[in-house]
């Protein structure tokens, strides 16, 4: 039906007869001629209908936007005065000789000027995907997947599929459960990742594995998260963490060069502790020049207790954030930033404007200056590198509150004041994460997952001091987004059982949930390490959008709903009975109300 795509026509096709298939993007009548912009997945081309071609011209009079059609025509060069430089095909046009209307279209429920809410776009996603920007994003996604496969194949990795119906294991989020009809009362879980299966593949002797795979997590959603998402999943045997990072960095560097033409260069490394101390985040955006600066030692003895109390507390922190040019901020704006910091637990912000640096304390403006004294103020100005027209924000509280609040403020100010350089890429590796973190209930949780190996300690040493252990883990960060994360895995049974014990997983629960893994660790398990990239997030970055739903063909909302198909839906009564499932409580009420 088609010999070439609309968007691929150029001057090399002049004089050729072509067959095109697509949609009417726009129709217009000009001086007895009918013109349409015809669209397919590759782009637009102008088609015109001459009254001398009576059959085609008569049919063209019936055309309306979004009619689906096939036509035959002759490619012609446009006169120089009519070349459209804003269209990729703007140097040519097609004189239609035959026209077939395949299907008509009702007026679209979406605004052609793109003044549509996201809910409208998701409700009529099949129409939203006709937009060139959406088509381009999905084409880029396909290019990325294809490039990854070629790279991994060339590096000797095997593409091996792992099960979608598996066993529920604690990996940090809630599982999506699938009831078994055959095994009454039992449930499969959709995998949060192929983590354990890829480790088992290493134990099976497949030393280089990869997979582009769907994963599922029942968690609260954000703009860059979905309940079902796609990972580029990788695992290796007999490779160190450094070697894994080298291969994966090369993959991303080559991918960026392929898609954007940009060379990312060698990725710097930063420890987790440095990232949190300097940037208030374990995924720092290095395009933003601002850094957090500790000043607790300078304010331990001041009369201002808001500063001195946390400065003398081992669990406290007093830090400053210098904002270049920030002295322009009004008092109202400063107060708004103080309220913003309260979202992250801070009790507000102290501030100091630097109007004339050379004048020392006389050149600053601050409601807390009188409590600090000239010597402390000068020390703060020196340490922060303050200059004329800067403002310095201060936060004093528990370490995590100060770090979170100033880290978030740094990002917001960077964008608000245009300090973040948005037209560059800033990749890095963050390494040496804590092995464990507090779970909020007096216990410990794995910072990554419970299969991550610690660095430089054996099982006995780990059990003796778990909170000081450093994980042999690493995250790749680009422009403030964690695009991938991985670790060296535990390959000894005693270490794995020790980690389970630290996480308060008793021996019975270990056997119930991980018995197959503990058994496998008895049979000559090789050292292994891996990583997983979020494909959706990579595509989001490479296509310049900030919403992951823009790069998934049929995404869910932030409420994990599909507005087009109206999923999830209530279960059929007979199907529920076959599965031995009874809906109770609020679910029962919702089901009855939904069907009434």
UniProtKB/Swiss-Prot annotation:
Binding residues annotated for ATP, in chain numbering: 217-219, 226, 482, 534-537
Keywords: Aminoacyl-tRNA synthetase, ATP-binding, Cytoplasm, Ligase, Nucleotide-binding, Protein biosynthesis
Localization per record: Cytoplasm
GO MF annotation, one: nucleic acid binding
Keyword Signal in record: no
Its EC number(s): 6.1.1.12
One of the GO BP terms on file: aspartyl-tRNA aminoacylation
This protein's GO CC annotations: cytoplasm
Region (Aspartate): 195-198
Described purpose of this protein according to its UniProt entry: Catalyzes the attachment of L-aspartate to tRNA(Asp) in a two-step reaction: L-aspartate is first activated by ATP to form Asp-AMP and then transferred to the acceptor end of tRNA(Asp).
Name used for this protein in its record: Aspartate--tRNA ligase
Organism: Sodalis glossinidius (strain morsitans)
């Amino acid at each position: 039906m088609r010999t070439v795509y609309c968007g691929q026509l150029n001057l090399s096709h002049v004089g050729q007869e072509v067959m095109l298939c697509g949609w009417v993007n726009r129709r217009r009548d000009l001086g007895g001629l009918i013109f349409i912009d015809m669209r397919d997945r590759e782009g637009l081309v102008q088609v015109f209908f001459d009254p001398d071609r009576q059959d085609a011209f008569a049919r063209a009079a019936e055309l309306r936007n979004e009619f689906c059609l096939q036509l035959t025509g002759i490619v012609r060069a446009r006169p120089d005065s009519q070349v459209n430089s804003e269209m990729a095909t703007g140097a040519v046009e097609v004189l239609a000789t035959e026209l077939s209307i395949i299907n008509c279209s009702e007026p679209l429920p979406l605004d052609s000027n793109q003044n549509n809410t996201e809910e409208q776009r998701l409700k009529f996603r099949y129409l939203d995907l006709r937009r060139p920007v959406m088509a381009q994003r999905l084409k880029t996604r396909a290019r990325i997947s294809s490039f990854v496969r070629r790279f991994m194949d060339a590096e000797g990795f095997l593409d091996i599929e792992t099960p979608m119906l598996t066993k529920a294991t604690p990996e940090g989020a809630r599982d999506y459960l699938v009831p078994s009809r055959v095994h009454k009362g039992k449930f499969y879980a959709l995998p949060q990742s192929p983590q354990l299966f890829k480790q088992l593949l290493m134990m099976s002797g497949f030393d280089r594995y990869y997979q582009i795979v769907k994963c599922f997590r029942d968690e609260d959603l954000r703009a860059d998260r979905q309940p079902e998402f796609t990972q580029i999943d990788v695992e290796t045997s007999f490779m160190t963490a450094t070697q894994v990072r080298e291969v994966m960095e090369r993959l991303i560097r080559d991918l960026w060069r392929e898609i954007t033409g940009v060379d990312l260069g060698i990725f710097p490394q930063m420890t987790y502790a440095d990232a949190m101390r300097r940037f208030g985040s374990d995924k720092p955006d290095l395009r933003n020049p601002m850094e957090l600066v500790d000043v607790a030692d300078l304010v331990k003895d001041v009369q201002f207790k808001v500063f001195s109390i946390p400065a003398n507390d081992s669990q406290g922190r007093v830090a400053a954030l210098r904002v270049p040019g920030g002295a322009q901020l009004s008092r109202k704006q400063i107060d708004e930033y103080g309220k913003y910091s309260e979202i992250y637990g801070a009790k507000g912000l102290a501030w100091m404007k630097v109007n004339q640096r050379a004048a020392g304390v006389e050149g600053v403006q601050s409601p807390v200056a009188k409590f600090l004294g000239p010597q402390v103020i000068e020390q703060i100005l020196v340490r922060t590198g303050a200059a004329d027209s800067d403002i310095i924000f201060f936060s004093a509280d528990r370490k995590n509150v100060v770090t979170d609040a100033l880290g978030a403020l740094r990002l917001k100010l960077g964008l608000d004041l245009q300090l973040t350089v948005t037209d560059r890429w800033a990749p890095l590796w963050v390494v040496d994460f804590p092995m464990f973190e507090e779970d909020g209930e007096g216990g410990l949780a794995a910072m990554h997952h419970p299969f991550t190996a610690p660095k430089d300690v054996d099982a006995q040493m780990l059990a003796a001091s778990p909170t000081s252990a450093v994980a042999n883990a690493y995250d790749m960060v680009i422009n403030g987004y964690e695009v991938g994360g991985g670790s060296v895995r535990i390959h000894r049974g005693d270490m794995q059982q020790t980690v389970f014990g630290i996480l308060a997983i008793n021996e019975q629960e270990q056997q119930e949930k991980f018995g197959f893994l503990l058994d496998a660790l008895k049979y000559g398990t090789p050292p292994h390490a891996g990583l997983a990239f979020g494909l959706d997030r990579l595509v989001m970055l490479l296509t310049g959008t900030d919403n992951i739903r823009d790069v998934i063909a049929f995404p869910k909302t932030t409420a994990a709903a599909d507005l087009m198909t109206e999923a999830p839906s209530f279960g059929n009564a007979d199907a529920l009975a076959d599965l031995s499932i009874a809906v109770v409580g609020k679910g029962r009420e919702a089901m009855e109300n939904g069907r009434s």
